């Protein structure tokens, strides 16, 4: 046995004896693909270059990515080829019809009904879609009519959506957490003739909202048999009439108005066409045919499908051979993962943060906690060396290998044990957290997109060499460029045309030469990889004129094990400050380990000297990475988190900065920023 192997086994044995961890922890795939570099160095690559990215057995040649200086604008621009334009008659219904033709008797959706998991084949689903679509036609739904839809992620969501698409309707999305006022605004903005809600609680909320909705004719509740009633009415509509309606739908027809969750402003209705979703769905499989065409692969849907991200992924899965599992809810996610054992997952960073915090909390503050902390460092160091040098050194690889059977493997099992491609998007992911998951063998890849780009406009294909902090290359069919002020601008067939009934917002969102201005700040490296550096609207300009991007500072503070959220403030203020919230589940064991009252109220914890001292350490660490003018001078710990329930977080788990500032305005004006006498 070699010295390295002997050392590895000795470390494993000692750790197992000390901890007896077994499977106490809850998978990244290994980045060590034979004959393939972990990191594609760009040190000697000129800016003007055409790049055919390296690939492994897990992904195909895909499309050519070109990165160069646009001679017309002088801006660094990167583009990835996509499929040719779709036929004029292509619609979302075709994705389901094609799946049924290819794999009619094989599973398409699996979901939980009561205590049992139910599987629906592609043929069965298509028959369901046609039955509901006929019923909608009977209700008088004409091509181009809007249907407002309020429903949690479920089989009913996919069925209703597909049926509305089949008969040429326009789906106006409502989050299941939206208020009565938001329901009213969406129904009126979309001129919806029908409102479909999932359950009686939503119906009660809707009943209080629709008195001032002149376009609304019917409210249908799924829980009380609404879809069955629609199907029954549909028996009077012939297949020929339905097929005539389906054939009338064109790719350029409006199919949906997706209402943004509004983290910095009032929600806007983004107009989407059949082409937007179909182009996105049919472009990705060209990049990863082995992953998406293998019938053994599965995906678990759990994010809100009212969000464009989750909805686009559903269409991508339908257009592939992947079997789709639908989670029963975020609270049952861990148990649902054990059933679905997904090879693909789409997550927002908050989910990964919760997984990490749960594992850390389970390890505790004793010997297990020491080992878990060491495992985190080992994984992060491994990926840092991979990023810097192309390969990790022998000692770093050995340290990482020692933790795999006792920490990393259990983490992979919690996520189902088969994950090959986990895409994180919707918000920035802490680079340290990404490095941990990737170093631990959990295949987390960052992507980037917006509702206005039909979700993904940049992504890291499976097998992409690790580029620390990058959200990837341009998604097939997209071009990305960086404006002179650092703003990311996007062009492509899947970019939205306008905001519904909002010409002013539309005009402000596009450049004179037709590029969508995202409002996000970033850079593109010589290999065409995009890095997000901040958001223009979040950019803080202090009273002294200093520009501060809050994201990187917030990420560091949130690494404190019991901090849930950090919001950095200071726009037009004399200095930078932060509001910090506590993760109660992580806080209590920390208090106990410090010999403090683990049952103290959150109000007391927010004032506790030891708690404040721990947070101060992370604030200090964040300050080390910025100039003095950008550093956090003062922070306040709040006794409540920012949540959807208190209106401070969107359904896509983004903190709504203006609402937080408004809610705590008195606190900010009297305790954070006191006027000089």
Question: What positions do the PLM features span?
Answer:
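Conserved pre-ATP/AMP-binding loop-to-beta segment of ANL
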Residues: 104-107, 221, 235-259, 266, ...
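Conserved AMP-binding/adenylation subdomain of ANL enzymes
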Residues: 278-298, 305-408, 418
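Conserved ATP-binding/catalytic segment of the ANL
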Residues: 474-542, 559
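Conserved AMP-binding/adenylate-forming core of the ANL superfamily
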Residues: 84, 108-162, 179-184, 231-235, ...
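Conserved ANL (AMP-binding/adenylate-forming) active-site segment centered on the GW(Y/F)…HTG consensus within
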Residues: 465-468, 495-519, 554, 594-606
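ANL superfamily adenylate-forming
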Residues: 24-28, 201-251, 359-410
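Structural core segment of the AMP-binding/adenylate-forming
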Residues: 2-61, 139, 166-232, 614
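Conserved AMP-binding A3 loop
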Residues: 119-123, 255-281
